[in-house]
Amino acid sequence: LLMIEHELDRVCRNIQHWESIKEEVYLRFPSIVFAIETALLDFKNGGIKQLFATAFSAGCKAIPINGLVWMGSKSFMLEQLKNKLSQGFKCIKIKVGAIDFDEECDLIAFIRSHFDAAQMEIRLDANGAFKANDVFAKMERLSRFQIHSIEQPIAVNQWALMKEICEAKIMDVALDEELIYTVDNATKLSMLDAIAPQYI
């Protein structure tokens, strides 16, 4: 906490140099960059605490998001799913790659036996857990469960392999950590052109 306070103090004392220090600050404290950019956008819009004039910011329209469901016992997962449905979620996100893959597939099959794709959209997040030697086979197996998309199936900085995965179209791919750890816009645009993911 002291480190972020110290960095925030340094940024505030050097705010006139924001454009030249922003990238360096982002590498260590992306939350500070988010805060400063939000404050600057608010200032640009007259300081009315409304960054964008949209139906969402006016409170007239919601943003559909997914409900996160944690892997666990079948009864635990079913309870979570029922809670998410009762809260109005039609889309859930499940983290994969942390426990035995066969068990994960069994749990996803269990979910699908209770909720078809029309009742519940399933998105997966692998957090880079799959390896080059198993990613295609694992995604092929997961695709049987009518999966909407998978976030970051492999670890970052494997652009050629990630491009192959996206081109294979076993299921749609969304980037996650790949975007977080790529700081400058030029590299980010090059990466997006090289990989061509279905979602970012």
What are these regions (language model features)?
Residues 99-200:
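Catalytic core of soluble alpha/beta enzymes
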Residues 1-122, 127-129, 136, 140-144:
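N-terminal capping/lid subdomain adjacent to the active-site entrance of alpha/beta enzymes
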